[in-house]
């Protein structure tokens, strides 16, 4: 009896010795499966994200081309909003307003029968237009959103602030006194029509007024995300000339020209804790856009390019990366897009040598010019 019990006990011990590693292996296997599932889910989310933006981008380019073609029925040279111009047409496309932020001017074109009174009426409407209203009247974006609906799950908020809030009622007399009026022919289907065109200069102080208008938001987000206020203003100046309705061909949106697919993705991850596409309406809101720009600069400074030791050298690299991406900055220093390898080269150079190397070897002329403009404007805005 005792012997039988001993044999039974030994068998039980043997079973337990075998079971422990089997359980451990089972747990490891389950963990690996969990990790694999997580990775697959992440990759699927990445793929869905890229696909959603690609669908939006394709629709945007198609709607842009279609709208431009429509406008040719009434305009010899159709003009559509871009980074430095905010353009609106009347519902019947017979009248047009163009706010040129680089030239600091407003041009209003109306049918001749509307007369100067019609021109002044359009000017008054324009000066009262809010960002919400401007967004609703943005034909290309509205048509694209109706087809695709980019970022529908993102918070939506343009703004009830006037687009041209930096222009005061007391500026109007001076602006109109310097107006240039001309009459010209424009197409009307197969025929032609007469158009009155009025161009008025905006106040010389307009850019500095706009900076002051956004100063509190810029300062708050610069402090929160540990980036230089002057750099943020310089980027805003270079990206949009302080045009809150700025939109590029990519498209990027708003004051600091955030592309939903690239900078916008990183910003959403940081701000909302998940990868999501930020909508045009969200990015046309100045508060949202300024925050997004500050967050992206923080990511460039303290994540992507953090291995660059000298603050001035890192600033030059960040400026270039804001325009072209960190990988393309690396290409100016090494054969490839390895940022860590590029940082090792950069850390052996003076800031001036880094700046000159970027100007000589960045892949694109646009980025070289961008670096020159933003660096010089940053210096100027430090004394603003």
Where are these regions (language model features)?
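Short, functionally critical alpha-helical segments immediately adjacent to catalytic or ligand/cofactor-binding
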Residues: 226-250, 257-259, 293-294, 318-323, ...
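Active-site metal-coordination segments of metallo-dependent hydrolases
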Residues: 206-209, 280-290, 365-366
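Short pre-active-site segment immediately N-terminal to the catalytic Zn-binding motif
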Residues: 226, 278-281
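Non-membrane alpha-helical structural segments and their capping/turn regions in soluble enzymes
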Residues: 212, 287-291, 312, 316, ...
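Substrate-binding/active-site groove segments that recognize
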Residues: 249-276, 288-301, 346-349, 374
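Secretory-pathway/luminal and periplasmic proteins that interact with or process carbohydrate-rich
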Residues: 240-249, 265, 300, 324-336
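Active-site/pore-lining binding-face segments in mid-to-C-terminal subdomains
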Residues: 307-330
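Cell-wall glycan-active module
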Residues: 2-8, 12, 20-237, 302, ...
């Amino acid at each position: 009896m005792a012997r039988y019990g001993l044999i039974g006990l030994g068998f039980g011990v043997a079973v337990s010795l075998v079971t422990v590693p089997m359980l451990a292996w089972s747990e490891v296997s389950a963990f690996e499966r969990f990790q694999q599932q997580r990775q697959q889910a992440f990759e699927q989310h990445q793929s869905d994200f890229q696909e959603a933006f690609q669908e939006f981008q394709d629709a945007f380019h198609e709607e842009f081309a279609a709208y431009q073609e429509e406008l040719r029925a009434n305009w010899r040279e159709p003009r559509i909003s871009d980074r430095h111009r905010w353009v609106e047409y009347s519902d019947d496309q017979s009248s047009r307003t163009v706010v040129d932020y680089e030239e600091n001017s407003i041009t209003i074109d109306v049918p001749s029968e509307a007369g100067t009174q019609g021109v002044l009426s359009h000017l008054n409407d324009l000066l009262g237009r809010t960002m919400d209203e401007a967004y609703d009247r943005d034909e290309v974006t509205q048509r694209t959103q109706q087809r695709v609906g980019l970022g529908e799950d993102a918070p939506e908020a343009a703004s009830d602030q006037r687009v041209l809030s930096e222009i005061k009622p007391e500026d109007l007399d001076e602006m109109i006194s310097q107006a240039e009026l001309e009459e010209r022919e424009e197409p009307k289907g197969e025929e032609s029509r007469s158009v009155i065109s009025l161009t008025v200069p905006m106040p010389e102080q307009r850019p500095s007024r706009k900076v002051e208008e956004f100063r509190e938001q810029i300062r708050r987000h610069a402090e929160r995300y540990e980036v230089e206020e002057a750099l943020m203003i310089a980027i805003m100046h270079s990206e949009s000339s302080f045009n809150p309705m700025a939109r590029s061909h990519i498209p990027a949106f708003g004051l600091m020209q955030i592309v939903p697919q690239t900078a916008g993705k990183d910003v959403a991850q940081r701000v909302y804790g998940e990868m999501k596409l930020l909508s045009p309406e969200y990015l046309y809101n100045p508060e949202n856009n300024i925050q997004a720009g500050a967050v992206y600069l923080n990511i460039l400074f303290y994540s992507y390019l953090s291995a660059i030791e000298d603050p001035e050298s890192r600033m030059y690299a960040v400026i270039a990366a804001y325009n072209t991406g960190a990988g393309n900055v690396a290409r100016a220093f090494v054969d490839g897009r390895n940022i860590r390898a590029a940082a090792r080269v950069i850390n052996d150079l003076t800031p001036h040598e880094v700046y000159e190397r970027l100007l000589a070897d960045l892949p694109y002329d646009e980025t070289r010019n961008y670096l020159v403009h933003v660096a010089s404007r940053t210096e100027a805005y430090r004394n603003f």
